[in-house]
Amino acid sequence: LGHPVGCSMALASLRELKSRNLPARSAEMGQLFLDELKRLAKRIGRARCQPRGLGLMLALELFHDDGAPAADIALGVVKRLLSDGFILLPEGAPANILAFTPPLTVGKLHITKLIRALGRALKEAYE
């Protein structure tokens, strides 16, 4: 059952996903994004930043040098990224996880811009 308008919208969405090959594109861009997060984590320090995710649903978990969840750093990074034009929220019980869920149409340029801004914000936060 369902409303005809809702069904029509769902079918149009499915056609768009298929015609633009968005599932495969999502997997490709997600891997690129995750690889960039891993490189960034290596520069910042793996004990401080732990990237993970699948497709375009990615996260970066932040810790202090003593291993404690770094909710304060996550909040500072979120505020800095907001001022740079990126919207994200800290997640998890201690709020030390930066979650990234870009649209399926995100491109390499946008990912690169976000990684640069994130790198600056993390560097400032951990200094």
Question: Which residues fall in each region the model found?
Answer:
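Conserved N-terminal phosphate-binding loop of PLP-dependent enzymes in the Aspartate aminotransferase
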Residues: L1-E127
